[in-house]
Amino acid sequence: MSFKFCFPIDLVFSTATHLETGSFGKATGKRISYRVIADCHAINNQINDEWLVRDAGGIVQQLGFSSADFAHQQIRNEGGVNSCIRPFTASQDVKGPYKGKGNDNEWGDLFAEILTSIISGKSDIIHQYYDRAGKGYYPENKMAVSFSEIEAFWMSFRNALPSAVFTIHHKIGREDPFFPPRAAIRWSLVGKHEGHGRFGQQTNAYVHVMGISHAEFGPWGLRNEYTLFDDIAIWKQIHLHEGRE
């Protein structure tokens, strides 16, 4: 049995052209690019379990929509609040064959400490462990450079869900010849939208966020971080709570 986790060097960067009418609306002919992270388990070179996050918010923004507006339109297109497809939550999770939690590695442990501290509101850890010239690649096709921009992303996200429960479901770190130390974590944040931040004014909607984060470390700290979650799925949960059709 072998386990494969896609690290930052394997992070999928996709390009596409919106040529046909479908789930992203009427064809626009626009060329877009977006990131995908997949946490995969394989046996005999065949993937039999996978967790995947696609930057859907980044896709729709390039097509001219906000994540909030697209989620609202998606509910309408799917028949309204009572009939639409529900966003993914833990209750819908189908248990697959992979039961592992990752490996025991100092880089995975360090990245877990960093993320846990950030979600707990201890943003000073960014100054402590990130490279001053470090970059963060975030949902909605955003890039942040250095402490202040990275901190702004995380605090806006954290402030929207201040009492939500952060859980690490999978943690792995690696050191390989000719590669920098790196780590990958699959996590969830579950709780009420009871703060003003990334998702606007508080609504008290109960929200489930599935995220995956990758880190690449250099001699001066964490130099490249990749975090993805689906903004549209989060906004859809908020709209459904509010009964918006």
Task: Please report, for each region that a protein language model flagged, where it lies by residue.
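C-terminal and inter-domain tail/linker signature
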Residues: 1-245
